[in-house]
A protein has these predicted regions:
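Kelch-like beta-propeller repeat domains
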Residues: 1-294
Length: 294
């Protein structure tokens, strides 16, 4: 199984990187590219490698190219799982590894803040810019026209952000804007974003309540001892701010979100306790009123 980010372009489905097992059975981040052709029902691994590992990243399409940003640092992530493998069943060693892994400042994880572009016609990667702030992992992404929004995500393992970034491709130069925060103060990761009748939607996600305060008070292992909470909130962007405008029937995170019939379709995911869910949810907006169909 590969946890990854996908993009549809030229009638094909592209899978960029992801997390899986290597030939030795170790969990690791990949930087390869696979293409699926629905007409022939066939997969092919392309002779293309991103300049960095890709996991927890987001992907969107603009003007014929796929864009990738965010995600964990490949060396740090892979090193963590290599250390755990070396520790085996030694609980003392495992506790030490976890403490060292989580007890760092956000900037010391080197989450990807570069924007990369992938051209399907040449299968080449290019530098397309970088965030003036910081990289995130597990953000929600949605785009319309020349604008793309990156919503929340992890700022470091266990610590979310409530930030919302806007990428504006209007004109010749890409502009990065920071919008009003949402799901404050702790933020969530693995949420869902979409657009319905021109209304920007953000729903669900999971985080650790109190982690932001812990981090601001100098506790780098900010989520230590905290229980993961699963959000049911549905927020709408309206008049320059976010309004809580509805609720999901249960907290949900890490599923698939798609535009469908001018609505946001959420498929599967995870709910409280890490339990997998197999149903779907359709979120529609009309006159700033949210309708949820299960």
């Amino acid at each position: 199984m590969r946890l990854d980010s996908k993009s549809v372009r030229d009638g094909n489905l592209y899978v960029f990187g992801g997390i899986g097992k290597n030939s030795e059975g170790l969990t690791q981040v990949f930087n390869d590219v696979h293409k699926y052709n629905p007409k022939t029902n066939s997969w092919v691994k392309l002779m293309s490698h991103a300049p960095m590992g890709m996991a927890g990243h987001v992907t969107f399409v603009h003007n014929g190219k796929a864009y990738v940003t965010g995600g964990v640092n490949q060396n740090i992530f892979n090193g963590y799982f290599e250390d755990l493998n070396e520790a085996g069943k030694d609980s003392t060693a495992i506790d030490k590894i976890n403490a060292h892994y989580f007890d760092k400042k956000a900037e010391d994880y080197f989450f990807n803040k570069f924007l990369l572009s992938f051209d399907p016609s040449t299968q080449q990667w290019s530098y397309a810019g970088e965030s003036p702030w910081y990289g995130t992992a597990g953000a929600a992404v949605v785009n319309k026209g020349d604008k793309t929004w990156l919503i929340n995500g992890e700022a470091k393992p266990g610590l979310r952000t409530d930030a919302v970034f806007e990428l504006d491709f209007t004109g010749d130069n890409l502009k990065w804007n920071k919008l009003a925060p949402v799901a404050s103060p702790d933020g969530v990761a693995g949420g869902f974003a979409g657009i319905s009748n021109d209304s920007l939607i953000f729903a669900g996600g999971a985080g650790f309540k109190g982690s932001r305060e812990n981090y601001q008070n100098g506790k780098n292992y900010a989520h230590e001892g905290l229980k993961k909470s699963y959000s049911t909130d549905i927020h709408l962007w309206h008049n320059g701010k976010w309004d809580k405008s509805g609720e999901l029937s249960q907290g949900r995170v890490y599923g698939v979100s798609l535009p469908w019939n001018n609505s946001l379709l959420i498929i599967g995911g995870e709910t409280a306790g890490g339990k997998a869910v197999t149903d779907s949810v359709l979120i529609s907006v009309k006159d700033n009123k949210v309708t949820v169909q299960n």
